[in-house]
């Protein structure tokens, strides 16, 4: 059985302990989503960032802001994506997300130069 350091998300270990086949199927499904060729990877991460803002999921916000930067997003693109949630989901969720997004963005490895 994999160790705690083998999990990408905190929910994985307890899920795997109780429902290993479900966890494996979910991991496979998520891997297929990550391998989509369109939209491009930066847009993909910005969309997933917006989804985590809407869900008010700070760990997800940090993760997708980090991944967005690692694939070339600028801070203005991250912040602009967050602000696009305000008409439908309100200002509070966006404002709360900003510090989590900044933490993730700042923790990212710089994008590779072409």
Give each language-model segment a name.
Residues 1-43, 69-70, 96-114:
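Acidic, glycine/proline-rich low-complexity segments that act as flexible tails and inter-domain linkers
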Residues 37, 54-58, 72, 89-92:
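Residues at alpha-helix boundaries and short interhelical turns
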Residues 79-104:
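C-terminal structural segments of small proteins and small subunits
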Residues 55-83:
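Mid-chain, well-packed structural core segment of small domains
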Residues 44-58:
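Amphipathic, charged-and-aliphatic alpha-helical interface segments
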Residues 48-51, 67, 80, 99:
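Hydrophobic side chains within alpha-helical segments
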Residues 24-29, 45, 59-63, 79:
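A generic alpha-helix surface/boundary motif
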